[in-house]
Structure formats: C-alpha cells, structure tokens
UniProtKB/Swiss-Prot annotation:
One Pfam short name: PHD_5
Listed Acidic residues bias regions: 780-789
Biased composition annotated in UniProt, kind: Pro residues: 592-603
EC number(s) on file: 2.1.1.355
Species this protein is from: Caenorhabditis elegans
Top-level taxonomic group: Eukaryota
Low complexity bias: start-end ranges: 16-31, 67-82, 429-443, 453-467, 1173-1183
Known role: Histone methyltransferase that mediates trimethylation of 'Lys-9' of histone H3 in vitro. Involved in transcriptional regulation. Plays a role in the negative regulation of lifespan and in heat resistance. Together with set-9, negatively regulates lifespan in a germline-independent, partially daf-16-dependent fashion. Together with set-9, plays a role in germline development and maintenance and might play a role in the restriction of the trimethylation mark on histone H3 'Lys-4'(H3K4me3) to target genes specifically in the germline.
Coiled coil segments of this chain: 1103-1217
Biased composition annotated in UniProt, kind: Polar residues: 207-228, 651-675, 881-899, 1258-1268, 1300-1311, 1554-1565
Taxonomic classification: Eukaryota, Metazoa, Ecdysozoa, Nematoda, Chromadorea
Gene: set-26
Name listed for the protein in its UniProt record: Histone-lysine N-methyltransferase set-26
Residues annotated as domain SET: 973-1064
Zinc finger map (PHD-type): 794-842
Length: 1645
C-alpha cells in the first residue's frame, strides 16, 4: 500500500480494551491504558535470576528480525511513540515495536557463574518443566513406525512428509510463518469446542499472575526490568500485534458468528474473540517456546502461551442474554474433580536426555496416585462429540482383538455376484447397530481417562498400542517425579491437536470427519479402534517409543484409489460404532457376543463449530506453499464433492432436524429435500429385496450397510406432484421467471446400469432479477411458491402471448421478459447484455406470425410431454400396490413434508452482479440470528444534531463490538452505481468481502460492494463520516444469500452520541470537500480534507500535464499527417508522370507494332496477289460455263473487292509521300490511252458510270457515248463487261470495277507505245470474245484468267479473289483436273521474282523519303530575307530551275535564291506495269525534275491530251512549256463534281471560260527596289494537262505558300523578272472582302 494511504487500523486497535480499574466498577467512557511492557532479555550473563523469572519476558530469536510475518510487541510508554512518516488521522496512535533481542541467556535461564558452570540436573529439570498453559502442536517424524501400525490396524496409509520440516525442533511452527496463534480449545479435528477454565488458571502474562505465584511459592521474588531496545519496523500486511483469537463474535471475511448463552447451546459455552470475560493466548516466540515459571528454564523447543487479558469478575458480558446460565466463574467445577471427556496433552515433543522420543508420565498418572489425596491436578475440559458414559481404563499390555472382517468391494447391487450379495448380507447381520457421535458436553462422566505406565523410566519398556495411547491422549511424563511435592501446582496442560491445512478448499466443510480423508477424530472410541484389529508385529516398533501424536493425513489430491476406497470404508464404519456403556468398556469387559444396545438420541453441535476450518485455514494463509497443478485441483474438486455429499448424508441421518442441518456446502434445503424424496421413493420401490435396502449416497456410491434408521421409522416421501413441482422450481431453465412451473420432463433420468451420477460441484440456477433470491436456498416447496408469488415479473413478447413456459430471457433495460424463440435466440446465444426490441430497436429475425406459431408449437409439445409423463407414472403406482407389504385395496401413504425453516426477510435489493457474487460465497454460521437481533434491538436513530442537520445518534449505551444497526438498501457492485468518492449521497462502499479472517486482502479489487440507501433504506442513511470514527461496517452472509452489512462499534459509545463511519477507501479521489462530522465548521482542520486537497492538487497537475502532452501529441500528429500528405501527393504526382510516360511509351510501341503488322499484312497481300497472278497465268483455259449460283457469288466478291480496294487506297494515300495526290488516279486512268493515234480518238465526252456498266460487250455501236440499257441486269444472269469504243476516251472512269474493261477495240496501235510484253501483239481475249456470242455459263477459272489478262492489257485495277472463293468446292470437272508440276515451278519462280521486285521498290521509296527529309532540314536552316516571297511548291522549284537554265538570265535581288534539290536515283525502265499508283508517282516525280530539252517517256494519256501535247511541242520549238503552277482558285480535277468557290476573272493567265482569246499574253512584272525593267517574255497559258498535273502534284495536306501571295508576286516567283504580262486591273473597292475570301481555307487546303 502506498505511503500516506489511509487504511483502517488492525482489529486489536479498533476494538481496544479498557484497562482494569478497580476503583470504577462501571465504565462510562472508554479509558485508554497502555499495555504492560514486554521486557527484553539482558545480554549480561551476570544478570540476576530474578530478571529471568519475570513473567513478561519476551524471548525473540534474532533470525526473526527480518521475517515478513513477525509481529512486534508494543511500547507502553506514550512518550516513546516514534513518529511514523505516514499519514495518520487524529486520535490514532501508531503501534510501537520492540527490537528483537539476541538469544543470549534467554528463556529464563538461570544466571551463569563467572566460570560458566554447567547446569545441574535439578536445574535442568526445572528449566524443562512446562508451564500450566504450555501448548504443543503435534508434529511427527516422517520415519516413525506409527505409520506402519496405523496401516496394519486401520488400512490407512498416512503420510505427513508434505507438511513437516526435517528438523523436529522446527515442526512447532516454521520461522517463515511468523508467530503462531495459539487457538485454545481445538479438538482433534480442529473444531472449536466449548471450554471453561478454573478460576485460578490464568495465563502467565495476565495481571496478577506474578502475585499468585509468589503466594503459592511462599513469597515474592524481586524482579528487575531491563529497558527494551526500540526499533522501528515497517508494517507487515497491516497486522499490528493482532491478538490471536479463536473466533470473533461476528463475521470478518467469512468467519462464524456466535452468541454466548443462546438457547440451544451449551450453558458453559464461552464467548470467543477478544473479550473481557475469558483468557486468550498468544505464542511468545517464533518456535512456540513457553515462558519461565518459578525460576525454571524450559527447554528451547517448548511452546508457551501468554494470556492477553485476565478474567474480570463482576463484569457485564458484551452480548448478555436473559437465558444465560450465570457467569463463567459459577460454571467452573471444583478443581479437584476433573471434567470427564477432557484430554491430557503432550508436554514435551523432544526428550531432554537423548534422541529417542519418550513419553513422560504426568503426576496424576504415577502408580498409587490415581484417586489419592495427592492427586490435585486440574485438567482443562475439552468437550468432544464422542459420548463417554463410563470410566475408561486402558492397559498398555492389553491383548489386542482380532481384526474385523473386511467389507466387500463397493460394487453396484445389480453388478454383484450371488457370493458377494450373500457375503454382504452376512456382514450386515454380524455388525452392530450404527453409532453416531453424541454431544458429550450435555452429560457428565465420572472420571477422566488416565493411562498408567509403571515402567515409564525404561526406554525399552513395552509400549501401549497406538490406538490406546493416541486416542487417550495421556502421554507419560517423568518430569513430575523429580520435582518436589511443594512445587507440584495444578497443571492445566494445553491440549494436543493436529493442525490441518485446508487452503486447497474454497469453502469450509461443516463435518470435519467427512471433509478430510483418513484421519482419526474424537468420535472414534478407543475400544472400537483397539478391537478392530490386533496390532501387528512391526520389526522396528519395539526398540523405540512411538512418536508424538498420529501422523498427518495425506492430502486428498495425493491419495491413490486404494486410499480413497479405504477412506470410504472407514466413513461407513464410523457410523456403526456403538455408544452404549457396554461397548465403551475395555475390550476384556465387553465380550464380543454381547449385542450392542440401540443408539441414544443425538444432539448435534452448534452451527458455529462447522466453520472452524475456516479459522484454521486463515491461520495458515500466510504460509508459503506451492500452487496446485490443474490435475491436483481437479482431483481435489472430485474428492471434495464426494466428501461433501457424504457429510450431508451423515448429518441428515444423525437424528437432528433436517431443516437445521441442510445448510451445507454441497446443497441447499430444496436440493437435500429432493434427494431425500427420491431416495425414499427408491427404497419404497425396491425394499422387497433385502439387498436393495441399502442407502445410495448422493456422491454416486452405494452404501452396503443398512440405513441408520429403520425403514419403518423414516418419514414417508411427499407426493410425486410436490416433488415434481419443487424440482421444477429449483432447476428451471435459463431465463425463466422464478415461480413459473416448467412442464414435466418427458423421461425421468434413469439411474440403472451401475452409472454413478455425480452432480456438479457448484450447481447454480437462475437468479431472480428483483431480489436476488435463489430457488435452491428455499427450505420447502411452500417457501418457493411464496417467493414466486411475491416476485413480480412482466411478460411482454413479440408473439403477443404472456405465458412463461419455455426458455425466456429478461431485458436489462425495461426488466420485461421475452421468449427466446421469438427473439431469434438459442441456448448457445450470448445473452449477457440482452435488450428487447423496444430498448434497442432493431429488425427481428422472426415475424409476429412466425413467433406466435412457434409458441403454439412449444405449448403443444409441452402439453404432450406432460401427458406422456402422466401415462408413464401410472405403472409405478400399480407396481407399488403389488408389493407384499401392502394390501391391494389400500392406497399408498401420503408423503410427509419436511418442516420449513423460518425465512429471513429480504430487506435489501440486489443487482445481478451482486447476486452472482453472493451466491458464490458461503453462509456465515449464526448470521440469521444476528440479523434478527440487530433488527429487533436498534440502538440508534436519526436526530437533529444541529439546525437542519440530521445524523444517526445512539439511544443507548453501546459497548465495543456491538451491532448498532443494519444498513439496508440496494446492493450492487461499485461499477454499477455512480457515487461520490469518499462517501456521501447516502451511498456506502464496503470492501469487507475482500478481507480474510485476519484482515488481509483476499480479493482482486473488483469485489467492492455499494449500498444505496436513498430509495430503500432505514435511518442508517443519515450516518455521517468523520476523521475520528467510532464505528465500522461489518458483514455476515445469511440464508438465501442475504447480505447483512451492520454498523459495529469500535469503542464504547455513550448515549446521545453521534455514530460516525470512516471515509470510503477512495476518499483521496474526491473532487469536492469531504463532509467531516468533527470539522464541519472548519474543514481545513480535518487532516483527511487537507490530504484530499493535496492529492487533488497533484491530480490536477498531473491532468494538466497529461492535457499538455495530449495537445502536443495531437499537434505532432497533425504535423506528421500533413507531411505524410505532402509526401503522398508528391509521390502520386511522380507516379502519375511515370505512368503517363509509360503509357505513352506503350502506346508508341503499340502503334509501331500495329504499323509493322499492317506493313507485314500489305506485303503478304502483295505476295499473295503475285502468287495468284502467276497461278492464274499458268492455269489452262477452260470452256466450262458457270452457273447462276457462281455468278451471284462473283457479284458478291466483286462488291467486296471494290470496298477492299477503296479501303486500301485510303490507307495507301496516307502512307504515300506528298507527291502522291488524288490527281494521280486520274492521270493513271488517262495514261493508258496517251499513245493512241490522234485521228482515232474523238473528243472526250463525259458519260455517267451507269451507262458504262450497261454497255454490251458483244454489240457495241461506234458512237461517241456508251450504250445504256433500259434496265439493270438481273442477279441470276452473267455480268456483262462494258468496253468503251475507240472514239471515247477512257479517262473519265475514276474507279474501274473488276469486270469493267477500259481497252480500245483498235488493237493496231504500235507496240512501242505500250508497256507490256506478253500481250503486245495480237488481240486481247476480250477482243476475241467480243466477236463471238458468249455462252450463258462458263468456268470460274476462265473468268479468273480473263480478268487477269484484262488487268495486264488495260487499266483495270488488279485485285485478288478471296480465299473462300478460290477454295470453294468446285464442280467435278474442275476437281478432276490434276495440277501440273511445271506450273508449280513457274509459280515459285514468279514468286521469287516478285519478292525481288518488291525489295527494290521499297529501297527506292526509302531513298526518296530520305531526300525529302534532307531538303526539309535545309529549308529550315536558311534564314528568310526581307521582301522574299514564300517558298514555292516542290513542283514549282523544278520549273524555276528549268527557266534559269533556258534563258540564261542573271540573278536579280527579287528572285528567290535557288535551293538545292535532292538528287533522286535514276529511273529504270520497268518491264511490266506494276500498277496505276506507281506509274503516277514516277511520272509526276520525273516531270518535276527533268530538263525541258529532254524527251519524256511516253505515258498512258488520252488521245485528246496526246494531240494537244504534240501541238504544244511544235509551237514551243526548241523548249517545252513548263507545267503551270497551281494557283489559288484551282481545284484538283475530280470527275463528276462541280467547281465550288472559284473566281478566275482576275487571273488573265488562265484559260477562263469567259475569255476565248488564246493569243499569247504579255505580263510585265512590277519593279522591286528600283531594279531595271526586265525584258518581256511571251508565255502562253499552261494547258489543261499542265494544270491537271500541277493540281495533281499539290498535296492535300500541304497548304501552298502562293495562297498568301499576290498575283504579281506569284508570277514573278514562277517566271522571273523577265515575264512580260499585262498589268492587272485595279482592285475592286471591297478588296478586304476579296482577300478574306481568298484567304479562306477550302476543303482541299
């Protein structure tokens, strides 16, 4: 716990005792008195002997100085109180400590002489003599022969090596455990028994002890006290000089509650705890050594106890009852008459003279002193549960009885063999009636059991049997033989008990003999143990004396299966032991043939004795031990369940009231009643067989013995209906409202087949949401029904039904119940925080109609199950009537109902978490009685202590540790309620549930209970807090999990005194001022308030620091996010750029790949075309005709070829150089007829395309126009070829279809003018077929061959038929023709030749493109001069160059500089016609670069152009007229289209339709910059052919520079400065409009 934290003081400081004041017989106010000083031991060896005789010496070993659990004594002088640097409230004295002393001349040793002489024998014996209050803790040697004896006699393999240390001297108590609290009055099973002490038997540390000793010895000896050394030690576990008490008058952490003198208890029952009416004992050193007495030095290892207080005469008892039987002193019997039933305890655990342990004979056990006058010993009576009706005598050499017959193996009855069943019956007949323990405290015996041992001085003397000596508890002693008679004072030996560590169990076991296996209890009569089996001869038993006490039992989790079986057998035999006078006699006085008498009626011990193990466990809480493994815990749980049910059965059949003994760990009254009903029904159903008259334990095993009570004496079972109803209440399904009856199960659980059903260890059932009551705690059926009737619950379900059958669940919000099936829940669903659809609106998986139908099915199923159960129960009644013990006409007897235990009213409300916590805790013994008394006798009420201030004020004198009032209200956990820290607002926080018996922390910090007294409470809500409280809160746990939190006084409180409580544990966390009752006017004077303010200031500073840190963290986080966002954006931008670059690269690669693939496709197409041409040329002619179907397919192919041709033309035009223009097609169309004679070619006349198609091939008249048929040809007829006549030019056809033949009929033209080889001579096939009638049908191969011939002879475009036509299934005649291998070779050669030609052509194209690129680069590098006209088109550059060469004129400054023209490779004469495009490109490029004097190669032109060209050549003379440059307004020649937006009136050089003058015109160019007038040159207008060629040479994609030049500049740039031409007319007024119109771009720009 942190420094400065306020905690409640220890119990001995809370409940401080007032001093002994003889002058004040009545105590009105608590008087503080310092305790007696505890003297240390002098280090001086010459110290006086009187110093060591001081009764208050506190010998301390120096090894215990730094032990964790060492408790230091207090310093009595107030002036020596050290200042502890911790926070302490007002009026609170910190504990004082005495420094541990060195072990020099300690334990009351006599003063040594100067020569350090050794002690004499008398002095040694005097030093070893124990005091009258010496307490020994039994501890055995691991190698003792006692284990073998007990194993041979009782089949109980004991072992104590798990707990005992190797050194016997340390077995009293380990140094690590701290001072051991001597709990007076423990029996062998560690149960607290009622005790009484003689009036002069007080502890050596109590007041008046030294005076009495001085009187007995004849005078007092002077004593010298030594000032003790002071040493400040830290507080150990907040246990500061805690008095070692046996029990406390009420519960602290689960201990029992007990009243003195309550009716039903023994009249001699002494109050336990720190009381003023009886002695209490405390060990004085770490090893349990005793104090010196009469100047004798006790042995080093002898324990001693010091009385905390003395018995005060004429003092009022704390809990005085009217029914008490007088005071303690009146109940003490005469000293000379020892009380029967008491034990003589072991005095010495280790012998003085040697290593062999020897028992010393007490003075009253010596020969000749039994019953003599010298026997004045007084024994402390310890009441046992074993009856003692006669005097017992045991002789050490008594003969041993024969071993009892072994019982048969615990086998299920239906699995027993006939021999086993017969043997079991025989054993049941031979055994005596079962004997149960009786309360010996309520009847007296004549004499005490004393064992005589005449030869005790010899170490080899015959030793008594272990059963006789250990059960008698009267060891022999030799010490009193050597002590003078005058020193033999009444010796009250501390009893010898066996310490059992039960910390492995979570709850105490009510019956000590059933909770731990294999241990001898006080209920075991010695003669039964002696007669059970004769002691076997043990080899090592004779030479040594037996050790002290019996061995410690083996822990349950370490027992083997054989040990468990032996323990179960012993549990049964414990209940068979006789208690009559004849059976208690020694074995020689009770013959075996005498039948034992029936057992007497029994009176059980009080309830408080059942909780004894909890106190013993709390003593050893601080003992370090190894944690249990999961396997050990599982074994412990199983064995604990078995033993708990055995304890229930044992106590239930012992003759006591079932309602009073059903408060056990293993089950509640309802559960025990259920078991008894079922058990009695089984007995009634099966008692016709003798072997079936056995008791079946709840633990699942069968008891082979008959029941303790005859079957006729057992109460009849209740009716089956009541049994079923009680079972349904106790075991209702999860979520069912309490009180609703579950329908009967269809089939009862079968328990045949030998199956052993083990109920769960902690069987929890559903708890009520209102008052937290559990059905299992109800004592009867009527009680459960009453509770159900009192409980109010509301069923509001989705289905609309309000019945409570089936599985239901409660809403935590509105506290209403719903059917789980209607809510869509199952038993496996998580319903920890369930809320209905009203509190938590949501869509339910089940609709209302489905929910109603489901509930109807559930109700029908439950009704059917109830009817089925009713039918099944009928044969049971018939079987019961057929029993021989009952008449057929007689009806079965009604089952009697067990009497109900009075219920305790529920004055508190409990939350669910609080109810779950309380149901897991054990009930406190006597809690109901204490709660009833506190509610009946209220010692305080609310009053006005100031104006408008109410408080709780006492109305009577309240003594220390008395209950003032019970706090009532709503009990909940600390996390379920909003409260003010420190206390207030009528809410009390209680942390006692986390405290153990000694006040140490037992919980995990989450078991803080809060009681809200605002809504439901009593006058305790007005209790105020104070820094000097006079009360505290304590709790008890009553029946039905009733938590009673009471206000208990920590000091004597007078009448009309305000009751105050300490602040809650979290008072430092309060943000408001504490309301201290002592400092209401000056809160600053309250130390708690000052401390709270300091903590609040620190807390505020810490909060401010946290806020600053949080703000800094937030800002840093924002900055970090901002930087991250910037980095993210930068990265995104870079990534986007990289993605775009990558995308562009991929697109470029894709485009390049696509272009490459397109080129490859074109090349493949070209190659395929050549292959088809070669194959068609080699294919033989066939006279077969085609069908109408083939004709239609040809027409479809023809249309597709036309579209493919157009698409190919468009693609080729985009890839061509700028020299290829749309005019090439026209030039190519007219170039085929240039070589025709001028006389045979008439003037060109346009004709529509339709007329050309409809001209007949066979009958063609010699007219100037094509013959046009009146109707188009039918689809099923052969397409007719249209052949133009001789007089009609073929240049008008822009596009020629595959079937259109544009060749002239006259084939007499010279062969020199035609560029073909194979068809240069002779007539063409078309001309031949035109003279004859073409048959209606012919073969497909013939058509293909004819088309290819026409393509070579005429201007018909070449095309390739698709593959599906070529590969189409042909007729039988064509299919039968076999291919010729010579044709295949020729085809291969042709393919190679075509590939070579294609390669050359591609190289030529690349060279032309390279020259063009070079020319463009040079043009960009040349700077543009002033007044220099724009660059002329490519076709004009050649004209300018030619003009310069012809006229030999000097350069003028106005003439643009000549630009170098790229040298093109010389053209080679082609052997064949490659195509129209190639011819056009070659002709245009050749004309632009050739000189005027060169003779041009003949071209395919029309006859009209041919004639005009010849006439122009004659007129020009030696030079040829250069081709005219394309000017603004000229449109490329297009067939069938009109000129748009053409204005030629202002252009005198052109052949305009408005001017018929063909004379030469002289044009004078203007002078530029004062240059001399050049000579005029007569230039004729260019011909139509020249304009056509100029227009054809203009690129569509290139906008000529002449468009932005004036007419004079264009003429000057074309013809130079010597051009003589008439001046142009003045411009019109709207010159701007004209210029704008001219500068407007057209669709050809």
């Amino acid at each position: 716990m942190a420094d400065g934290e306020h905690t409640l003081p220890a119990d001995e400081e809370l409940f401080e005792q007032p001093p002994l004041q003889q002058q004040q017989p009545e105590i009105a106010e608590p008087i503080v008195m310092a305790q007696e000083p505890i003297q240390g031991v002098s280090e001086d060896p010459q110290a006086s002997e009187a110093t060591h005789e001081a009764p208050d010496n506190y010998p301390v070993d120096h090894q215990m100085e730094n032990q964790e659990f060492y408790q230091e004594p207090q310093i009595p002088e107030p002036q020596q109180i050290p200042q502890i640097p911790v926070f302490q409230p007002a009026a609170y004295n910190p504990p004082n400590y005495v420094a541990p002393q060195q072990r020099a001349n300690n334990f009351g040793e006599p003063a040594a002489a100067a020569d350090s002489r050794p002690l004499t024998e008398e002095e040694q014996l005097a030093a070893e003599r124990p005091t009258e209050d010496t307490v020994w803790i039994d501890s055995d040697d691991d190698t003792d022969v006692e284990e073998a004896i007990l194993r041979a006699n009782f089949w109980l393999p004991y072992s104590d090596h798990n707990y005992d240390p190797p050194d016997p001297a340390d077995r009293i108590i380990l140094p690590t455990e701290g001072p051991f609290p001597c709990i007076a009055g423990l029996d062998e099973d560690c149960n607290i028994v009622k005790q009484w002490m003689p009036e002069d038997a007080v502890g050596p540390g109590s007041p008046g002890t030294q005076y009495r000793r001085n009187q007995q010895t004849g005078g007092g000896l002077p004593s010298t006290s030594v000032a003790p050394q002071q040493q400040q030690l830290p507080v150990r576990h907040n246990i500061q000089n805690r008095p070692m008490v046996a029990a406390q008058p009420f519960s602290i952490g689960g201990n029992q509650v007990e009243y003195g003198g309550i009716g039903g208890m023994d009249s001699r029952m002494q109050q336990r705890g720190v009381v003023r009416d009886g002695p209490q004992y405390r060990v004085m050193n770490d090893f349990g050594n005793g104090l010196p007495m009469r100047g004798q030095l006790p042995p080093r290892n002898s324990p001693a106890a010091n009385a905390i207080n003395r018995v005060r005469e004429q003092q009022q008892q704390m809990y005085h009852q009217a029914g008490a039987r007088g005071s303690l002193q009146q109940r003490v019997p005469a000293p000379a008459a020892p009380t029967p039933g008491s034990y003589q305890h072991i005095v010495n655990a280790v012998p003085v003279g040697g290593a062999n342990p020897m028992r010393r004979v007490p003075p009253q056990a010596r020969p000749g002193m039994i019953g003599g006058a010298a026997n004045n010993n007084r024994a402390r009576p310890i009441h046992v549960t074993r009856p003692m009706d006669t005097q017992e005598f045991e002789h050490p050499v008594a003969p041993a009885a024969a071993a009892p017959p072994r019982r048969v193996v615990d086998v299920a009855p239906h699995r027993m063999t006939p021999e086993q069943r017969q043997e079991l019956q025989q054993m049941n007949r031979q055994r005596a009636a079962p004997q149960f323990p009786a309360a010996a405290a309520q009847r007296s015996a004549e004499k005490i059991v004393i064992q005589q041992r005449p030869g005790a001085s010899s170490s080899r003397a015959p030793r008594p049997s272990m059963a006789q000596e250990d059960l008698l508890r009267s060891p022999t002693r030799r010490l009193s033989e050597r002590v003078p008679q005058e020193h033999q004072t009444p010796v009250l030996e501390p009893r010898r008990f066996q310490v059992k560590v039960t910390d492995t169990y979570s709850t105490p076991i009510p019956k000590a003999s059933d909770q731990l296996p294999a241990q001898l209890t006080e209920e075991d009569p010695p003669e039964e143990s002696a007669a059970a089996a004769a002691p076997e001869d043990v080899p090592d038993a004779a030479p040594e004396d037996p050790p002290k006490g019996i061995l410690k039992p083996t822990p349950p989790h370490r027992m083997t299966q054989e040990e468990k079986n032996a323990h179960f057998a012993r549990l049964t035999t414990d209940k068979e032991k006789p208690t009559s006078s004849a059976s208690i006699l020694p074995q020689d006085a009770a013959p075996p043939h005498v039948p034992p008498p029936p057992p007497p009626p029994l009176v059980l011990r009080p309830h408080h004795q059942d909780e004894t193990l909890a106190m013993v466990q709390s003593v050893f809480e601080s003992k370090p031990r190894q944690p249990d493994t999961p396997k050990d815990k599982e074994a412990i749980s199983k064995i604990a369940d078995l033993l708990r049910f055995s304890a229930d059965e044992f106590t239930g059949q012992s003759g006591s009231s079932a309602a009073a003994r059903q408060r056990t760990v293993s089950g509640s009254a309802a559960r025990a009643q259920t078991y008894q009903m079922h058990h009695q029904q089984q007995q009634q159903h099966h008692h016709q067989m003798p072997m079936d008259q056995r008791k079946r334990h709840s633990s699942g095993r069968y008891d082979a013995l008959m029941g303790a009570m005859p079957l006729q004496q057992q109460p009849p079972p209740p009716p089956p209906s009541q049994f079923q109803h009680t079972d349904s209440i106790a075991h209702r399904p999860r979520g069912r409202p309490k009180g609703t009856r579950h329908p009967s199960v269809a089939v009862q659980p079968q328990r045949s087949g030998g199956a052993r059903t083990l109920p769960p260890r902690a069987q929890t059932v559903a708890m009520s949401a209102r008052n937290g009551a559990n059905a299992k705690n109800s004592d009867s059926e009527s009680e459960g029904i009453d509770e159900a009737a009192e409980e109010s619950w509301t069923m509001r379900c989705h289905c609309g039904m309000d019945h409570g059958d089936g599985d239901t669940i409660e809403c935590e919000g509105c506290k209403t119940w719903q059917h789980m099936a209607c809510m869509g829940l199952t038993l496996k669903s998580n319903t920890s925080k369930y809320k209905c659809e009203m509190c938590l609106p949501r869509r339910l998986p089940v609709s209302k109609a489905e929910a109603a139908r489901e509930q109807e099915r559930i109700l029908n199923r439950l009704r059917a199950a109830a009817k089925k159960q009713k039918r099944k129960s009928e044969p049971v009644e018939q079987k019961q009537k057929s029993q021989p013990s009952t008449s057929r006409k007689s009806a079965p007897m009604a089952l009697q109902q067990q009497p109900a235990e009075p219920r305790v009213a529920q004055l508190n409300d409990y939350s669910k978490q609080a109810s779950a916590l309380l149901f897991g805790m054990e009930q406190t013994a006597g809690a109901d009685t204490l709660l009833a008394e506190s509610r009946l006798h209220k010692k305080a009420r609310r009053m006005f202590v100031e104006e408008a201030v109410e408080a709780l004020v006492t109305t009577d004198l309240v003594q220390i540790r008395q209950v003032i009032l019970e706090v009532n209200g709503h009990v909940s956990m600390s996390n379920e309620v909003k409260r003010q820290p420190g206390g207030g607002n009528c809410i009390f926080m209680y942390d006692g549930l986390m405290k153990g018996t000694a006040g140490e922390d037992m919980g995990d910090g989450q078991e803080l209970v809060c009681i809200d007294t605002k809504r439901k409470g009593n006058d305790t809500k007005f209790t105020r807090r104070s820094c000097v409280p006079n009360c505290v809160l304590k709790h008890v746990l009553g029946s039905n999990a009733t938590l009673g939190i009471m206000i208990v006084a920590t000091k004597d409180i007078t009448r009309n005194t305000e009751v105050t409580l300490p602040f809650d544990a979290d008072w430092r966390e309060s943000e408001v001022e504490l309301e201290c009752a002592e400092h209401m006017k000056e809160l600053q004077a309250c130390p708690f308030e000052s401390e709270r303010r300091r903590f609040a200031a620190e807390r505020h500073r810490a909060m401010d620091h946290k806020k600053r840190e949080a703000e800094e963290a937030r800002r840093a986080d924002e900055e970090r996010r901002r930087l991250e966002e910037e980095v993210r954006r930068e990265r995104a931008a870079k990534t986007k750029q990289m993605d775009e670059a990558e995308k562009a690269r991929l697109e470029a690669e894709k485009a390049a790949e696509k272009e490459k693939k397109a080129k490859e496709r074109e090349e493949a197409k070209e190659r395929k075309k050549m292959e088809v041409e070669a194959s068609a040329a080699a294919a033989p002619e066939s006279s077969n005709s085609i069908t109408a179907r083939e004709e239609r397919r040809i027409q479809q192919a023809e249309e597709m070829f036309r579209r493919q041709e157009e698409e190919g033309k468009r693609k080729e035009a985009r890839r061509r150089s700028k020299s290829v223009t749309p005019g090439v097609l026209e030039a190519a169309g007219t170039a085929a007829r240039e070589d025709a004679p001028e006389a045979s070619i008439p003037a060109p006349a346009p004709s529509p395309p339709a007329s050309r198609r409809s001209v007949s091939r066979t009958t063609q008249p010699s007219t100037s126009s094509f013959a046009t048929p009146t109707e188009p040809p039918a689809k099923n007829k052969r397409m007719r070829s249209v052949v133009p006549p001789k007089s009609e030019p073929a240049s008008s056809a822009k596009r020629v279809r595959a079937t259109t033949v544009a060749t002239p009929k006259d084939t007499t033209a010279s062969n020199d003018s035609r560029k073909r080889k194979s068809s240069a001579t002779g007539k063409t096939p078309v001309a031949k077929r035109s003279k004859n009638v073409v048959p209606t049908s012919f073969g497909l191969a013939l058509i293909e061959k004819e088309l290819r011939e026409q393509a070579r002879d005429s201007t018909v475009l070449e095309m390739i038929l698709p593959d599906y036509i070529m590969k189409e299934k042909r007729s039988g005649l064509l299919a039968g023709q076999s291919p010729d291998f010579s044709e295949v070779r020729a085809q291969i050669e042709e393919e190679n030749r075509m590939k070579e030609r294609f390669t050359k052509r591609e190289a030529k194209k690349k060279a032309v493109e390279k020259a063009k690129e070079k020319e463009k680069k040079e043009h960009r590098k040349e700077p543009k001069k002033a007044n220099e006209p724009g660059p002329a088109p490519k076709s004009e550059k050649a004209v300018e160059k030619a003009v310069e060469k012809v006229e030999k004129k000097p350069k003028s400054p106005q003439k643009p500089p000549a630009k170098p023209t790229a040298q093109k490779p010389p053209l080679k004469k082609t052997e064949e016609v490659d195509g129209i495009e190639r011819e056009a490109s070659e002709s245009s490029s050749k004309e632009s670069s050739v000189a005027p004097e060169e003779k041009k190669n003949p071209k395919k032109i029309t006859f009209a152009e041919y004639n005009s060209r010849r006439s122009q050549k004659r007129e020009a003379g030696e030079c040829s007229t250069p081709p005219a440059v394309t000017r603004r307004g000229f449109i490329p020649s297009t067939e069938g289209e009109d000129l748009v937006n053409v204005e030629l009136s202002a252009i005198p050089l052109d052949d305009h339709p408005s001017s018929s003058n063909t004379a030469p015109t002289t044009t004078i160019a203007p002078s530029v910059g004062g240059a001399p007038k050049p000579t005029s040159v007569v230039v004729k207008s260019p011909s139509t052919r020249s304009r056509t060629r100029g227009a054809a040479s203009e690129s569509v994609d290139d906008a000529p520079a002449e468009h932005s030049m004036s007419l004079q500049d264009r003429v000057f740039s074309m013809f130079g400065s010597t051009v003589d031409a008439p001046a142009p007319p003045p411009p019109p007024p709207a010159s701007a409009e004209t210029n704008s119109r001219r500068s407007r771009s057209t669709r050809w720009n």
